[in-house]
């Protein structure tokens, strides 16, 4: 049951981001309430920021870390990789189905029926629970290192966020493609150049 609660919180984070267009920015076990029906509610959202806030992606990473730390250290369960959770929260539904769907579920939806499937499931907690369950678990020291690397990455929304040193590294041939440095995120539905 603890693992289900953990997954439900991740689904709520996605719904908050995708539907409400908010990042909590201070999410931890102290901002969660479990109602008697077993439903989890996220509270204390007054400091939440919109996805286009300059620090929104960093806040989201910290929210993910806080939730993972709580469930891993206090509740002693295996948790998902932080980068996988991040992707689960911010990606378009189509990408989620492609990356996290399984052969028995969403991946097998025919192209003709996908728009109907998307309408029914992109904000449906039950459907999202099936997808979140397919994220990769953090099981060893290598996974822990990957989380540490992800936490320390400088995330950028667009090319305007690049610093002069990044352009210098590009000219010197130390960076092949700028797009790999930019979070593939379309909060305003703008394509990344």
Give a label for each model feature.
Residues 1-23, 35-36, 41, 50-94:
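ATP-dependent phospho-/nucleotidyl transfer catalytic cores
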Residues 27-34:
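Hydrophobic residue at the +6 position relative to the catalytic HRD Asp in the kinase catalytic loop
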Residues 69-193:
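Regulatory N- and C-terminal appendages and interdomain linkers associated
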């Amino acid at each position: 049951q603890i693992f289900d609660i953990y997954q439900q919180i991740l689904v709520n984070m996605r719904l908050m981001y995708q539907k409400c267009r908010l990042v909590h920015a201070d999410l931890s076990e102290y901002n969660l309430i479990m109602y008697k029906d077993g439903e989890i509610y996220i509270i204390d959202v007054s400091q939440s920021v919109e996805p286009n806030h300059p620090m929104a992606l960093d806040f989201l990473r910290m929210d993910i870390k806080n939730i993972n730390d709580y469930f891993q250290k206090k509740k002693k369960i295996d948790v998902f990789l932080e980068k996988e959770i991040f992707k689960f929260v911010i990606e378009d539904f189509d990408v989620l189905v492609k990356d996290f769907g399984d052969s028995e579920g969403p991946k097998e939806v025919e192209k003709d029926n996908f728009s109907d499937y998307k309408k029914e499931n992109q904000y449906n907690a039950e459907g999202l629970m099936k997808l979140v369950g397919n994220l990769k678990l953090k099981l060893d020291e290598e996974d822990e290192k990957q989380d540490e690397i992800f936490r320390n990455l400088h995330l950028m929304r667009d090319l305007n966020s690049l610093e002069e040193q990044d352009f210098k590294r590009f000219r010197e041939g130390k960076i092949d493609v700028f797009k790999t440095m930019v979070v593939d995120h379309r909060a305003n539905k703008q394509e990344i150049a």
